[in-house]
Amino acid sequence: MTSSMEEDDSISPESISLDTLASIRSLIINADTSDSVISSVFDFLTGLLSRGNSAILHHVLKLLSDLAFRRKELAPQIFDSILSNLLRLHNTVAEASHERAAVESLAVLASLSERTPSIAAALSKIDDEVFASICLGAPISSRLWLLRNADRFNVPSSVLFTLFLGFSKDPYPYIRKVALDGLINICNAGDFNHTHAVEGCYTRAVELLSDAEDSVRSSAVRAVSVWGKVMIASKEEEMNRRDCTDAVFLQLCSVVRDMSVDVRVEVFKAFGIIGTASESIILQTLSKKVLGAGKGKKPQNLLSNGSADVSSAAGVYIHGFEDEFYEVREAAVDSFHSLSVNSIKFPDEAVYLLMDMLYDDYMVVRLKALKALHHIADLGNLKIQETYMPAFLDAIVDTSENIRVEARNILKLAKLPDLKLVNKCIDGVLKSLEMYPQDEPDILSALFHFGQNHTNFLVSMVKRFSEKLGTASGSKAEFNSRQLSASLTLIISAPLSNKQSITSIPPLAFSYSLAMLGKFSSGLHDMMDQDMLLAYLTHCAILSSSSGTEFNKGDVFFHAYRDSNADLAGNPVLLPGKDIPAESKYMACKAELEIGNQALKFVNHILLKIKAAWLLSQSGCSKEALRALRACKQELATLTADSSISKGTLDFICQYVHVIELLVQVWPHFNYSRHISTCSSVEVELLMEEVEIKLMEIRCRFTGLSTEESLVLELVIFGCLLRLYKFEICCRLSCMEKLSSTISQLELHHEQQCTKPSDFLTETKKSLEEFGSSDDINSCRLLDLIKIFKCFSPEQFTFSVNLQCVSAEVEVPGNGPYSPISFVPGLPVAIPCEITLLNVPRDTCLWLRISRNDETCQFVYLDPNLYNGNGREKRFMFTAVTYMTPRAVVFTLRVSIGIECLFEDICYRKQRHGPKHPVAYLCKEREIHLSLVSRT
C-alpha cells in the first residue's frame, strides 16, 4: 500500500475504503514506521484534503490530527495544510457538506494550536469574518460546537457579542442557551462595557426569562444578574444606581416561583451576585404580606417590565426556605450572606427563618444556615432568644462534625441576655462534650470565648461549679473529668476580659488549671501558647491567694495579651467592650482578608508576645518571661528566608529579642533593692556590658532602619539610666555624656521622621536638665524613669524592605593545620584573605582584626576603594601583613572583620594605629595556621 501511495497520485477519493484508512492509521500509530513512510502518508493525506469529498474528509482530518500528535515535527506543516484547505472551502460555493468540513477543520486547528504553542499565533489567520461566516452557515450541531468553543479562537469580543446576541433569538433552544452562556462569559471577562450594548443584552436576557425551555430560562437568570450588575455599575449618580439595583432585584424576584428547580436555584444565586437592594424590598422578601412601605412602589429604571413593583418580592425567601428541593433551600440560605452585609434590619428579621433551617433534613442546608448565622454574629447583629435556643443546642450535639464546629464558632461570638439562657447553653455544650470527647480542644476554646463574653455572670458561674471543685479534691476520677476541665475553662476566662477582683475566683480553680496545663494549652493554642498560659495561670494563682489583692497589678500583662490577640486575629471578643458599628466591623474583616499575609501576622504576634513578656517580668514573673522569650526565638527560627518577611527584618527581631532577654535577667536586681552584693554586682555589670554590646551591634549592623531606630535608641537610653541607678559613682560622667548624646540623636531622628517623641524620651530629657551638673542624682526619679519605659510599641516596626543586615566572611584559601603559612620569627608575614561583604554601605570604616592566643591583637584598615562597588555582595582579595610572629615552631592567629561605630562620641583607644571608636564584629573569628620555615 505504501508503494501505491508513492507511485499513484491519481487515486480517486471515492475508491478509498475505510479499510485503507484503517491501514494508514496503523502506520501512523506504529512507532517503528520509518520517516519515509510517514512522509508518504503525510503527502497522501494532504492531497486528499484538496480533492476529497465529504464522505472521507472527516476521516482524513482525524488521521492528520493523530499524525500531528505522534509526529510533533510535522505539526506546523499539517496545521498550514488544514488552514489552507479551510480558507479554500470558505471561498467556494457554500454547501452543507463544506460547512461541516469547515467546522471539523476548525476543531482540529484549535486542538493543534493548544498542543503546539509555537503555531498558536498562526490561528489569527482565521479572522472574525471567516469565523462568523462559518458560524452562520454551519448546521445545528456544528453551530452549537462553534458557540461553545468561540473563546478558543482570536475573535474580537465585539464580534462575539454580536453573534451571541443574534443567536439568542435562534429557534433552537440549545443554541439560545449557549448564546446566553457566551454573553455571560463576555461579561465576566470584563472587556465589554458599552452602555447601549449592556442595556440591550440585559433586555434580551429579561425577555428570555419567559422562554419555554427550562435550560434557557436558567441561563437567562444568570445573564440578568451579571449584565444587570454591569448596568448598575455604569450609572453615574447614586440615585440611578439604587433604582437600577432595585429594578434588577425585582426582575429576579418575578421568576422565583418558576416551575424549574434549576431556575429557582439560579435566582437565589443571582441574589447573592447582586448583593443588595432597598431596605423595603429586602424586608419584603421576608413577609408574604405586602408591607405598607412597598405598596405601589415601582423602580424607575426597570427596562423591560413596567408592571413590576415591590410586591413581586413578597415572601421570596420564605418560598426559598420552604421549597421542597434542598438545592433551592441551600441556595436561598447561601445568598443571605451578601444581603445581610448591606442591611441593618434584615438580619434581625431573618434569624428566626435561619433557626428553622437548622431542623432541615439535609446536612448541607443546616451547615449553610449555621454559616449564615455565623456571618451575622460576626457583624454583631445576632441576638439569640429563648425561642431559638433548642434549635441551636441541637446543632451543638449534631452527629455531623462540620455542623458542631460551625455551631461552636457561633457560640464564640454569642452574647446571651440572661443567666437562664447562659446555663442552658453551658449544659448543651457539656452534653456535647460527653457525647463527642474528641471535640474537647475545640469545646474548651469555645467555652473560653463564651466566658469572656459573659463576665457579668462570673459570680453565678463560679458558684455553680464550686461544688465540682470541692468534689474534685477528694476524687481522682472527678479531677480528671472532662466536665471539670470545661468548668475551669469558663472560670479562668473571665479575668482576661474584665477588671473584676480576682479574689472572687477560688485559688483552687487556678491550681487545678495549672495541673491541667497541657489540656488547656491544646484547646487555647489559637489565643496563647503554653508558656504564656502558664505565666497567666501562675500570676492569677498568686494574686487570688493574696487576701484583698486586686487585679490591678496584673493589668499590664492582660492588656498586652488582649491587644496581641486583637491584632493577630481581629477577634471582636477580645476587644474592649465598646459598641462598634456593624459597617466598621465588616470593613475591618474585609481588610484583614485582603492582607492575607500569614507570615506578617505571625511576626506581629511574636512582637506583641515580647511586650507581654516584658510586662510580665515587671510583675515579678521573670522566669515565665524568660521562658516566653525563648519560645519566641524558637518560633522565629521556624520562619524561612523564602517567607514574605525579609531576612534583615528577621535578624533584627532576633537581635531585639536577645536584648530584651538580657534586660529581663537584669530587671530583678533593680526591682527589689538598690544595694546588692559584690557577686550580684559583677553579674549585673556583665549583663549590662552584653546589653550595650548588642545594642551597638544592632546600630552598626543594620541599614535601612526607620521607625525601628527610635526603638534601639530608647533602649540605649534605658541602659544608661540603669547604669546611673546602680553604678552612678563609678560611671556617672561617661553615662551622662552618652545619655545626653543619645537623647540628642533621638530628637533629631524624630524631627527627620516627623514623628512624636515618646513620653519616656520627654520625661528623661526633662530629668536630665534637672540633674544638670549636680553631684547628687535623685535615685527615686531615676527609678520612676526606668519604670515608665514601655520597651516596645508595634508602631516602631515598619518591616521596611530596605532593612538589611550587614555581614562579612573571611577565608584564607588553602590554609589549614596540614597546609600552614610559613613564617620567620620576628619578621612580618603576609596573610592572603578572601573577603566577602554583604550589604556593607560605602561610608563605613572596616578593620581586619588579627589576634593571638595571648590576647595580643593588631588592626589592619580596609581601604573603602576595595569594596566601593554598587552590588549588594562584594568579593575581593586582601593581603594583610602582621608583625606578631613569635619564636615558636607553630602557632595560630585568629582573624575577623569589624565595623567601627563612628556614632560613639567617646574615643576608647589611645594607640596611634587602629580604630578610635568601639568595633562591632561582622563575622566569627577564623583560625590561621602558621609554621616555622624549615631549614634545608
From Swiss-Prot:
Induction description: Up-regulated by SHR.
UniProt keyword Cell division present: no
Annotated Gene Ontology cellular component terms: cell cortex; endosome; nucleus
Gene knockout outcome: Embryonic lethal, when homozygous and no visible phenotype, when heterozygous.
Annotated keywords: Cytoplasm, Endosome, Nucleus
Subunit description: Interacts with SHR, MGP, SCR, JKD, CPC, TMO7 and AGL21, but not with LFY or STM.
Task performed by this protein: Intracellular shuttle that promotes movement of SHR from the stele into the endodermis. Required for SHR association to endosomes and localization, and for intercellular movement of SHR.
Protein's name in the database: Protein SIEL
